Amino acid sequence: MATYVIGDLQGCLTPLVQLLEQINYHPEQDKLWFAGDLINRGEESLETLRFIKSLGNNATVVLGNHDLHLLAVSHGYGKLKRGDTLAEILTAGDRDDLMDWLRHQPLFHYDEQLNTVMTHAGIPPCWDLQKAQTLAKEVEDKLKSDSVDEFFATMYGNKPNTWSDDLTGLDRLRAITNYLTRMRFCDENSKLDLESKEGINTATKGYAPWFNYPTKVPEDCHIVFGHWAALEGKTQKERIHALDTGCVWGGSLTALRLEDQQRFSTPCSINRKNP
């Protein structure tokens, strides 16, 4: 039995099928983790969502910012952006089933046996493992609730950009969501810079990649995340694994086998909708 963590798909099903063939995936014994952003930009978003849902208990998913964007639009909040490839999902006959399944997925997953935690964007320096899990559950519970519309109505926005335990209500949920699904750079106090999106060397003065600061996550715990294609899969940290390698932009799709930290990748042709 093996567990593979796969980076951002963004609606690229064909490379996923190729990667599963490469790793000789056996559904009766192997498990797949997906680090979020299952859909959007790629031309196979509907097929990708259906495929991952069909994997059932073999798939563990955490939500990314594109997945949350789809959910918000499906609830009547937010607007489709140029380059989005979500219309086919929104008009599909099984749309409601897909959206219900998606909003019941977590933002945080921790496997005690593998001592590995997965979120879409990472874990900010100011949170320990238990705090990250507890805060993620606040958003997860809201997503599953009958009052989810008020969350989607206020989900978009870059503020608050500094964590405080005193945050309450929808501001608190937006901050948690941004840390877990949009974070790249922050300062030593975990204040977010959500404007900078390129590589490590492009940080605004006073900011650095979140994983370059001392972390409260135990030293023996591995962190796997996606979201940041400009890293090209590199963090220079032995236990912090970046898995978004830009599949939808013509890069590659990457899987990390957790049992031995071996990486597998398959090259991708550009598979995005032209803006």
UniProtKB/Swiss-Prot annotation:
Keywords: Hydrolase. InterPro entries: ApaH (IPR004617), Calcineurin-like_PHP_ApaH (IPR004843), Metallo-depent_PP-like (IPR029052). It comes from the Bacteria. Disulfide bonds: none annotated. It holds the Pfam family Metallophos. This is Bis(5'-nucleosyl)-tetraphosphatase, symmetrical. The keyword Hydrolase applies. GO terms for molecular function: bis(5'-nucleosyl)-tetraphosphatase (symmetrical) activity. HAMAP family: ApaH (MF_00199). The keyword Hydrolase applies. It catalyses: P(1),P(4)-bis(5'-adenosyl) tetraphosphate + H2O = 2 ADP + 2 H(+). Belongs to the Ap4A hydrolase family. Hydrolyzes diadenosine 5',5'''-P1,P4-tetraphosphate to yield ADP. Its EC number is 3.6.1.41.
